[in-house]
Amino acid sequence: MESTLGSDLARLVRVWRALIDQRLKPLELTQTHWVTLYNIHRLPPEQSQIQLAKAIGIEQPSLVRTLDQLEDKGLITRHTCANDRRAKRIKLTDGAEPVIREVADVISLTRCEILDGISADEVSLLANLIERLEQNIIHLQNK
């Protein structure tokens, strides 16, 4: 019998993300917005769009739409780099900080609810297995 592990993991990611989107809807944000805000917040100040896309692991054109939405919401600003007019630097606005804290609380609570009934050891084991799978895949890609 063929393993459905890949499909099972993909389904888990989809339903997890859908739950996060549902929980963030009252804040008019999505999981994609959160991942972007979180990475802008944790990286050194005024990263370029290229650096941010690499940190998130997506292509720059995919990032631009999300940044447009975050800028429209007043959570970030973008300005042209002085030494490279093609590049844009991203900065969180003062209004972003309380939103980031509120979203972090929603994400943390949701994560706790998702992991309810699963021991810390089980979570650690799962994380280690996922890491090993990822390393195996990276190794195979580099062959």
UniProtKB/Swiss-Prot annotation:
A Pfam cross-reference name: MarR
Gene Ontology biological process terms from the UniProt entry: response to stress
Keywords per UniProt: Activator, DNA-binding, Repressor, Transcription, Transcription regulation
Keyword Transcription: yes
UniProt DNA-binding residue ranges: 49-72
Positions of the HTH marR-type domain: 2-135
InterPro entries: HTH_MarR-typ, MarR/SlyA-like, Tscrpt_reg_MarR-type_CS, Tscrpt_reg_SlyA, WH-like_DNA-bd_sf, WH_DNA-bd_sf
PROSITE patterns: HTH_MARR_1, HTH_MARR_2
Entry's Gene Ontology molecular function annotations: DNA binding; DNA-binding transcription factor activity
Gene3D superfamilies the record matches: Winged helix-like DNA-binding domain superfamily/Winged helix DNA-binding domain
Self-association and partners: Homodimer.
Function: Transcription regulator that can specifically activate or repress expression of target genes.
HAMAP family the UniProt entry points to: HTH_type_SlyA
Family, as annotated: Belongs to the SlyA family.
Protein name as catalogued: Transcriptional regulator SlyA
Biological source species: Edwardsiella ictaluri (strain 93-146)
